[in-house]
């Protein structure tokens, strides 16, 4: 059982956050799982976190569900509240990888509000050529039976990603936290290019 002082230490423990940024199909989820497992970090997918809250009918989940039922987007403040709660878990003691958040500059600035407790350490930007990305996602759609991905829809998503994340990357670049990762090629090679920044 932790002592009073250990509890106080836990409260002030700095869990460093590592952000994985990249367009859909860039392979960031695959690498996040591998890196998290190797270095004892928590892998936090904001999409999974949101679904878990809704499925478990938590207070935050109920708010999120009512917002989504009205066809609205869940607010950044609500996602941050879920994130703060998640980061308080024991598996986050060594730090965490954020997969899917932040996606925009306002979200990054919301994350700054909790930086004294959970500072952002590194931001990995997964870079993939648009045509390579289109082929990857179309191939994935064929093998998984997903037919909702068309070349046009993928290109639109890539364009939105680029527009949203360019200011975000600039924001973290100014803090010297950005590492650009060539996300084309062998999965193990890409993994080692990321892992060397954790050693």
Where are these regions (language model features)?
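Glycine-rich phosphate-binding loop of ATP-dependent small-molecule kinases
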Residues: 1-199
């Amino acid at each position: 059982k932790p002592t009073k002082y250990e509890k106080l230490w836990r409260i002030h423990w700095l869990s460093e956050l590592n952000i994985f940024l990249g367009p859909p199909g860039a392979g960031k989820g695959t690498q996040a799982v591998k890196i998290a497992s190797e270095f004892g970090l928590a892998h936090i997918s904001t999409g999974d976190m949101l679904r878990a809250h809704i499925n478990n009918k938590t207070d935050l989940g109920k708010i999120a569900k009512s917002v989504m039922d009205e066809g609205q987007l869940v607010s950044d403040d609500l996602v941050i509240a879920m994130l703060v709660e998640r980061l308080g878990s024991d598996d986050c003691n060594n730090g965490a990888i954020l997969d899917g958040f932040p996606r925009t500059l306002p979200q990054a600035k919301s994350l700054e509000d909790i930086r004294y407790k959970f500072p952002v350490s590194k931001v990995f930007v997964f870079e993939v050529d648009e045509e390579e990305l289109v082929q990857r996602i179309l191939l994935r759609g064929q093998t998984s039976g997903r037919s909702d991905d068309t070349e046009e829809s993928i290109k639109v998503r890539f364009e939105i990603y680029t527009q949203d994340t360019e200011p975000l990357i600039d924001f973290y670049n100014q803090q010297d936290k950005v590492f650009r990762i060539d996300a084309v090629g062998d999965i193990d090679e890409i993994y080692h290019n990321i892992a060397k920044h954790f050693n």
